[in-house]
Amino acid sequence: MGPVTALRQIAYYKDRNRHDPRRVMAYRNAADIIEGLDDAARQRHGQANSWQSLAGIGPKTAKVIAQAWSGREPDLLAELRADAEDLGGGAIRAALRGDLHLHSNWSDGSAPIEEMMATAAALGHQYCALTDHSPRLTIANGLSPDRLRKQLDVIDELREKFAPLRILTGIEVDILEDGSLDQEPEMLDRLDIVVASVHSKLSMDSAAMTRRMVRAVANGHTDVLGHCTGRLIAGNRGIRPESKFDAEAVFTACREHGTAVEINSRPERRDPPTRLLHLARDIGCVFSIDTDAHAPGQLDFLGYGVQRALDAEVPADRIVNTWPADTLLAWTGSH
């Protein structure tokens, strides 16, 4: 194992364990620095053990590089690997074929598209939808129509490199206050997957929020209703209560319009809450279990969401990302 692989694997496990993103980035940046050196420079620093003389390499990352350079597994990587927990999910986890909600550094993710897709492929995914944010969410560097067009070109160029993993085009589009979607319809027409989520005015009154969400899930472009309550139950962003809405009306609209309800796997979200997950199941909704990953290691969060689906006795055939890619895309194209 070389230093670049070791550093990226450490970043992966730290992301998976929800360590401070700034500290994780130190390992990802160090991997980029070492990867950017030519062979002669690597040999020179390796023989002199002078890795820390490189700008951006600190004592912790230098130790990892030196240990990997010597041909041994770095102590930190061995420790992280040994401590990695089984995130659950059982048979349904094995049946999942992909992830329909994840972010790259084109919006507020921490890693390039290539690294996210390489990790997805290593996890055995058959497909992944890249769903960076839409323009109204400026705090997350949401993609304008022009930037989204450029991203689609980049994805086209990457498809052959990552085959047989299928990279699906997508977006996490904001549901605006009136229930419309925050992207040009012609751009939404070009995408494989549209996840629609509320990110603003989360505390509006129940009747208005219900109208807003029903209009969004009835939109023919919407495939998945993302993190429906918007709640946060833990984490460095603090606690945020659930939005108030008529869940029966919203989930009935999802069923009638063929929109999946997302089971968001992020530990700080656990959205929808258990009572609403049971309600959506009983109403007859289909579901999408997604990571909402903003870093490579978070792509393994699927186990959290799958365990919740198992606990709620959601039938596997009603989870859209257990379906083959062609079946999934036929479904997204049918509504």
How would you name each of these model-derived features?
Residues M1-A91:
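Long, highly charged, low-complexity intrinsically disordered interaction regions
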Residues L7-Q9, L130-P135, G284-F287:
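Short acidic (Asp/Glu) and glycine-rich catalytic loops that position anionic groups and cofactors
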Residues D39, W51-Q52, K63-I65, S70, ...:
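Charged catalytic cores and adjacent phosphate/nucleic-acid-binding surfaces used
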Residues L100-W106, Y127-H133:
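Ser/Thr-glycine-rich phosphate-binding loops at phosphate-binding pockets of nucleotides
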Residues C128-D132, I167-G170, G226-H227:
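Short beta-strand segments at enzyme active-site cores
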Residues E172-D174:
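Active-site beta-strand->loop->alpha-helix modules in alpha/beta enzyme cores, enriched
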